[in-house]
Curated annotation (Swiss-Prot):
Enzyme Commission designation: 6.1.1.6
Main location group: cytoplasm
Subunit note: Homodimer.
Record Gene3D superfamilies: Bira Bifunctional Protein, Domain 2, Nucleic acid-binding proteins
Name this protein carries in UniProt: Lysine--tRNA ligase
Amino acid sequence: MSQQQQGAEQAPDLNNELQTRREKLSALRDNGNAFPNDFRRDAMSDELHQKYDAMSAEELDAANVEVAIAGRMMTRRIMGKASFATLQDMGGRIQLYVSRDDLPEGVYNEQFKKWDLGDILGGRGRVFKTKTGELSIHCTELRLLTKALRPLPDKFHGLADQETRYRQRYLDLISNENSRNTFKIRSKIMSAIRQFMVNKGFMEVETPMMQTIPGGASARPFITHHNALDIDMYLRIAPELYLKRLVVGGFDRVFEINRNFRNEGVSPRHNPEFTMMELYMAYADYRDLIELTEELFRTLTQDVLGSTIVKYGDEEFDFGKPFEKLTMKEAICKYRPETNMADLDDMDKAVAIAQSIGIKIEKSWGLGRVQCEIFEEVAESHLIQPTFIIEYPAEVSPLARRNDDNPFITDRFEFFIGGREIGNGFSELNDAQDQAERFEEQVRQKEAGDDEAMFFDHDYITALEHGLPPTAGLGIGIDRMVMLFTNSHTIRDVILFPAMRPGK
């Protein structure tokens, strides 16, 4: 049967189901309050399983534990005068045992048996185990709290497609335990990061989401208009310049976890609205941040997943081992062995290498940009195990401090896992004159057609002129981190409501 034929047959069934449920709701309204709000639960399903799964039936009977629980009815088996139903709440699922003789008169036949899957119930009763050993609640009170007018997805062949999971995330969360677990892990990661940062002496702060000058990264911004001020503003592409202003102000260790917005493409690794954690630490350099990054990931994997070994697809990452460190040019030569490292320092030869692997050279690019493009093409996807890439050219690092021994490069690193960038950190540029010159170069690139080049931020230069102490900064993509921790292969699976075209 074709999908079109299936859809044609399903439509009448669904319409009949909707009509039947609306009629039931109408009857509830006629009989009183159809949406009561006076039931209070005192237990969650996961708590009950944790406390009582290990107890025997006899021990539970002796304990005589009574609980009140509420959630969505996911399954039901009616067997004459008694039935079983499965209730789902935020913690998981628990079975209800519903007997006609244990409920007030009329509740079983006139109410419970007429309720539908997807309805939200509240039940009160004694915790016990069935003959098969399943933890259950023997209900002495059972109430309908919310009438669901639409059926559960799996009653009509589940969610239609992957896109529906993202558009109607509520249905995905109702029917997909893996999705629920993904976002529970995400929440644990966020909490663990905050605890780690506080333990390290950092203060959490918030900086503007709307900015008059979008800075802190090379990206195309979203533009909006502030009516009261009558000025165009930009959704931030990064909080970096504001956070460093705070370091100038005397807050030596700050971090922020929040959204960034970049008006760019959508892919399995990119969403225009995404979550970043940025931190800044005075009197430190990029090497200190490399150590901090290793410790952060080691701590998170252990605290959130219970192990420093993370499985992702066919790969296995061991965060308990020291992470690999390579210079950008070492990585190029490692994954393109025919490359002569000295050729990478010659503009003509570097351009020839780039063109030989299909890179289109822009007129505004210097040697540093060419090197970076070669690295991204030949090496980045091979950086599977946790790896730090260091010695990024100054040309592609407009906010990073130049290396003391080689001013062509900066004291910067990027952190890769599974062939994708997870973090970016560097010793901060605190020379106001050097920063102004780099902003001017960015302006020239923007005028030459690079719409991702940075704007000149005069106020930030003024802040630097007041003195930024030696500082190191780090940004980590939270969404990509969650992808790794949950074995998710598209960023849409770890963002509750990813960006999508409006539905028809």
